[in-house]
Amino acid sequence: MSRAKFERKKPHVNIGTIGHVDHGKTTLTAAITMTLAAAGGSVGKKYDEIDSAPEEKARGITINTAHVEYETEKRHYAHVDCPGHADYVKNMITGAAQMDGAILVVSGADGPMPQTKEHILLAKQVGVPNVVVFLNKEDQVDDKELLELVELEVRETLDKYEFPGDEIPVVPGSALLALEALIENPKTQRGENKWVDKIYQLMDNVDSYIPTPQRETDKPFLLAVEDVLSITGRGTVATGRVERGALRISDNVEIVGLRPTQTAVVTGLEMFKKTLDETLAGDNVGVLLRGVQKKDIERGMVIAKPGTITPHTKFEAQVYVLTKEEGGRHSAFMIGYQPQFYVRTTDVTGKVVGFNHIQMRNPSSVAEEHSNKMAMPGDRISMTVELINPIAIEKGMRFAIREGGRTVGAGVVTNIVQ
């Protein structure tokens, strides 16, 4: 059996379901695949096929995530659903599954709950740009006014975390009743069942409200240097993977991080021992540079389009601290902790200079007392970090925290201080 070819006929968008435990994220994911399967746009997946999510490793952390794919008339989607709350936190912070938009699932019977708020906050901080709401379990709410109150509360919560609460589409429905109708008759089409129609209505909103993302190739060029070689008579070659953008021969570039920024000219590009005229996002390339010595470049610097990235030493970040079971620390750490911050291709020593907020793994009144003074394994924290050397950092960038070569945390930059 040969592999099916991935055909790029429609724009591709990455989305995911977020929301409080038991509000119906996985049921909705199953209902979407079954609905669109009836329209010929996906392979239907039942609840238990999605719920038994396989483990993945991202930045040294094990995460359970289920990936499904489906198509609407307009787009091709890759959809991620995580079974456990901790998996969401880890997924969003490590960027294991990047989301261009999210479907926030809120039970109409319960309204926004603590994890609803935490997921919205996380989505905001890790840069999920757009959200569409599915107000689930509509069949369990007898009073229409009650449902309207829940919708209002959801919109206010979104506003509070700086999403446009008034504009965001909110679609009421019942994922379970839609799923049951589709299991009974897998060929149910649009217009044949009230609950299945709500799923179509939700996907119409996802199609129209969540914009197609800008492709990595259209962004300004950036390559993280992995290795540096010197070719006698030709110059210096830096190798690495192109993170974004495109680069051509004779382009000017800046070499940023660890030392004062330098400029150079690209005189050649090589991949798989062949020369190229242009390199694109995702390529592993060797860039031949004129105007710099081998000693001037080292692993951990980046080569970028001039003026697009600057070196920094101090930033704020959202961090997930690994538990002992995940191979992390066995004990808490305080302000003043000095681990290595692994950014792109290198470790840089840094110091935790402040905790801004700690979402504890096991909140209790006693724990609240010392909450902003120490971080325990399993906590999610917002912290301020100061590095000993300036490196190219930008908002939304992911990193790992390491100690003696092992990963003890994962983070995402939420704000640059200096």
Swiss-Prot record:
* E.C. number(s) listed in UniProt: 3.6.5.3
| Disulfide bond residue pairs | none
Q: Which residues bind GTP?
A: 19-26, 81-85, 136-139
Q: Where in the cell is it found?
A: Plastid, Chloroplast
Q: Which reaction does it catalyse?
A: GTP + H2O = GDP + phosphate + H(+)
Respond yes or no to whether keyword Ribosomal protein is given for this record.
Answer: no
- Protein's UniProt keywords contain Metal-binding: yes
Please tell me where Mg(2+) binds in this chain. 26
- Please, which domain of life does this record's source organism belong to? Eukaryota
Instruction: Note down the stretches annotated as region G1.
Output: 19-26
- GO (cellular component) term, any one: chloroplast
Segments for region (G3):
81-84
Please report which protein family the annotation says this sequence is part of. Belongs to the TRAFAC class translation factor GTPase superfamily. Classic translation factor GTPase family. EF-Tu/EF-1A subfamily.
Q: Which NCBIfam families match?
A: EF-Tu, PRK00049.1, PRK12735.1, PRK12736.1, small_GTP
- Purpose of the protein: GTP hydrolase that promotes the GTP-dependent binding of aminoacyl-tRNA to the A-site of ribosomes during protein biosynthesis.
Q: What is this protein called?
A: Elongation factor Tu, chloroplastic
User: What gene name is given for the protein in this entry?
Assistant: tufA
